[in-house]
A protein has these predicted regions:
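The feature marks the first
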Residues: 1-26, 30
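Amphipathic alpha-helical coiled-coil segments and their boundaries
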Residues: 3-6, 10, 38, 86-89, ...
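Alpha-helical transition-metal enzyme core signature, strongest for iron centers
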Residues: 13-24, 38-56, 100-103, 125-139
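Acidic/histidine-rich alpha-helical segments that form the ligand environment
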Residues: 20, 26-27, 76-116
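Inter-helical turn/loop segments and adjacent helix faces that build the functional surface
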Residues: 26-36, 113-120, 146
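Leucine-rich amphipathic alpha-helices with coiled-coil/heptad-repeat character
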Residues: 52, 56-59, 63, 111, ...
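Carboxylate-rich helix-loop segments that flank metal/cofactor sites and access channels
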Residues: 54-89
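Charge-rich amphipathic alpha-helical interaction elements
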Residues: 119, 126, 134, 141-148
Length: 148
């Protein structure tokens, strides 16, 4: 589905955050390694939703919403957020790394498209992308058996 309006993109961002939070909750329930880190990602996801919604509701108007600021294909950022029973821990963590890359790409692409029309929403997207980008490092440390 191609998203054109800010509200569509915000709603999709919310779904990415909530879906990936569920993935990390499930991952922490299945494996003993890195539980604290994974649950911290869940909390951060909830904060990300609040941050994005604040930026959106703080600047949105009918004039901005009426124009089509985006041309984002949601299928390009689709996530598989379920973990099959018996999945090897390293495979699940590698999937988490891929998921983070996809979500960061979404936020950076959306920020770039929205930049000319509004400042606060792209700034929030870039901030969330930066936080999520750091997760890749933490996940890779978990893969090597090191603590963050």
């Amino acid at each position: 589905m191609i998203m054109h309006t800010t509200s569509e993109v915000i709603d999709f961002a919310r779904r990415l955050e909530n879906g990936s939070a569920k993935f990390y909750e499930d991952l922490s329930a299945q494996y003993a390694t890195g539980v604290d880190i994974l649950l911290s990602f869940v909390k951060e996801n909830k904060k990300n939703v609040v941050q994005i919604e604040r930026a959106y509701y703080g600047v949105i108007s009918d004039a901005i919403e009426g124009c089509f600021a985006f041309n984002v294909e949601s299928d390009d950022y689709a996530l598989a957020t379920s973990i099959a029973p018996g999945t090897i821990h390293a495979d699940a963590l590698n999937r988490a790394v891929d998921m983070e890359k996809t979500i960061v790409k979404f936020y950076l692409d959306a920020a770039e498209q929205a930049g000319p029309l509004m400042a606060d929403v792209p700034r929030a997207f870039k901030m969330v992308a930066g936080k999520r980008d750091d997760r890749e490092r933490k996940l890779r440390l978990l893969l090597t058996g090191k603590s963050t």
